[in-house]
């Protein structure tokens, strides 16, 4: 085998300046070239160089700079939402670090980075050295962080005209309509968002439990959230998880309801009680921790990114998005963009309840100057409910795409 002629022959022929086309009469070592190939190699015929607005600068395959800027109104048609896709090991986190460094240098936006694995720790250190304020949040037991998932319930009492339907028959129609009219702006459905949070607490994010949830159950949940909101607004305090649990138990005492409905209400209240005690109670059943004013907020999902914490992760993410939304509403006239970056997005988006929520909230963000950037590794992880979100996002960056 060591003395095989063919490998040695090929090695010699492929040495620089050794190959002689005239000697290759059978055309074993040559192939047809098209005029396009020659044009691509010519210096007068280059590759795309982008829009010329250097918000983000990369290099194309020819080594020339390619520039584009999602935050520039001249570069976008609809929005600056961005989707970064690539298989494992393709460099999503490294690319995001590169992009965020460039965008921060040019626009100095307010950044909210949700990650798992400390991929942006050095970026935070670098930004802090250059004078930016950096706030780090770790979602783990004992971290002292408190997220109030029902904190926005006061809006239901403050603006009752904007409360969406409580009719059980119309609830599924809302979901069908959400998949249509992606381009249209819509009012925020606060009651629908709070219902999603309550359902996640009741079902624990389990498919089997979610399948048991009927439209009548959902209507009762919405009514109990409204009851809790009215009670807490009268007492001038934040709506906590225990208030919704108590409202479910109170309605279960209603003698006019059938026994089966009352038993179901008690069952849902007991399920929510898991989020009112222990570590989950510390995180989700206290008045929310005030977020300090910072240029960059890095949220490490930590414990919640592991298996078995699906409900806690989803509720925490909803609370984070609500926090970003409140800041965006407050600062919408300051002209400073807000970018919410989610790395390892497949951890978040695989929950079918979260996708409609993200679709609704990000549709509003276009008017508030806040942008949703998502990085994930597998499109198959996205549920069908996430299709409107993908249609809405204008900017896609694909890294080393697999053949299929």
What feature does the model see in each segment?
Residues 89:
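Walker A (P-loop) phosphate-binding loop of P-loop NTPases
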């Amino acid at each position: 085998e060591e003395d095989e002629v063919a490998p040695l022959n090929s090695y010699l022929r492929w040495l620089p300046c050794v190959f002689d086309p005239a000697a290759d009469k059978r055309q074993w070592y040559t192939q047809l070239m098209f005029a396009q190939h020659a044009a691509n190699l010519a210096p007068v015929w280059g590759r795309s160089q982008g829009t010329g607005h250097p918000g983000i600068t990369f290099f194309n395959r020819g080594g020339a700079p390619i520039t584009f800027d999602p935050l520039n109104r001249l570069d976008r048609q609809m929005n600056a939402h961005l989707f970064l896709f690539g298989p494992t090991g393709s460099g999503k986190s490294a690319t995001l670090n590169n992009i965020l460094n460039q965008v921060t240098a040019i626009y100095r936006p307010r950044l909210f980075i949700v990650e798992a694995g400390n991929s942006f720790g050095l970026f935070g250190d670098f930004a802090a050295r250059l004078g930016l304020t950096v706030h780090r949040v770790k979602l783990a037991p004992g971290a002292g962080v408190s997220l109030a998932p029902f904190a926005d319930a006061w809006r239901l009492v403050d603006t009752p005209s904007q409360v969406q339907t409580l009719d059980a028959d119309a609830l599924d129609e809302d979901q069908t309509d959400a998949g249509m009219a992606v381009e249209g702006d819509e009012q925020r459905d606060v009651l629908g968002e709070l219902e999603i949070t309550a359902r996640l607490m009741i079902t624990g994010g389990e498919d089997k439990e979610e399948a048991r949830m009927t439209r009548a159950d959902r209507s009762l949940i919405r009514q109990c959230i409204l009851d809790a909101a009215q009670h807490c607004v009268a007492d001038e305090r934040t709506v906590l998880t225990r208030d919704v649990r108590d409202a479910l138990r109170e309605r279960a005492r209603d003698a006019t309801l059938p026994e089966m409905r009352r038993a179901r209400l008690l069952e849902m209240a007991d399920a929510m009680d898991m989020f009112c005690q222990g570590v989950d109670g510390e995180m989700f059943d206290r008045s929310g921790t005030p977020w300090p004013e910072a240029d960059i907020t890095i949220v490490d999902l930590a414990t919640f990114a592991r298996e078995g914490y699906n409900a806690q992760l989803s509720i925490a993410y909803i609370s984070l998005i609500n926090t970003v939304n409140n800041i965006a509403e407050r600062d919408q006239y300051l002209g400073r963009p807000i970018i919410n970056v989610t790395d390892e997005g497949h951890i978040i988006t695989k929950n079918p309840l979260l996708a409609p929520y993200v679709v609704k909230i990000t549709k509003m963000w276009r008017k508030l100057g806040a942008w949703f950037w998502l990085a994930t590794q597998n499109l198959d992880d996205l549920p069908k409910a996430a299709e409107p979100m993908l249609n809405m996002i204008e900017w896609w960056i694909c890294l080393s795409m697999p053949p299929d």
